[in-house]
Amino acid sequence: MVFQSPTTLENTIRTIFPEIWLRTLAIKTCFIKRERKIKPEVIFWVLTLGFCVHNQRTIAGLKRLYEIEANISISDSSWYDRFTPELVEFLHQCVIHGIEELAKEPGRKLSKKLENFKDVIIQDSTIVRLHSSLAAKFPAARSRTVAAGLKVGVMVSAVANGPKTIALYSEKSAEIKTLRIGLWICSGFTSYI
C-alpha cells in the first residue's frame, strides 16, 4: 500500500506499526482468519488516519476510502462484517503497543550539564481553597478565620514531560512531608568517586 507524500505523523506511525507486525497481530487476535480482500494493514491505516478534524466519516465513507487505498472493490456485506469484537481486540492491542512504544522513548533530551542524570524530577505544590465546612479535614495554614485548604502535590518528570506522582494533602502539610522518595528514585542518581 502506497500513500502519496507521507507526513511526519504518518512516518512515525509507520515505524511504530510496521505492516508485518499488523498482519501478525491480525492473525493472533483472529481479526483475519485468511487474507483475501480485507488487508489488516490497510484497514488499520483507513481507520486511524481516515478521519479528519472537520470531516465526519461514515462506515460507507471508510469503505470507499479502503477501496481507494487497497485498489479493490468489495461488497458492503464483506466490509460491514469486519466490524466485530475481533476488530476491537485488534485495535485495542494496537493502542497498547503504541503506548508502550511511545513510553520507551523520552520526549526530551537533557542539556550537556545534566546529561549524566537519567531524569530531572520537579516537585510542585498548589493550594486550592475549599469550603469552610471542610476545615476539620483540610485545615488552612495561615488564616484568621475558619478556612480549609488543599495542597495538590505533583512530581513532574522533565524528560517525560509528565507527572510521576500526584497526591492530595492538607494545606498545613510541610513540603518535606509531601515529597515521597521511594525505590523508583534509586536508578535516578549516579554517584561519582
Where do the language-model regions lie?
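Conserved, well-structured functional cores that handle cations and Mg-NTP chemistry
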Residues: 1-193
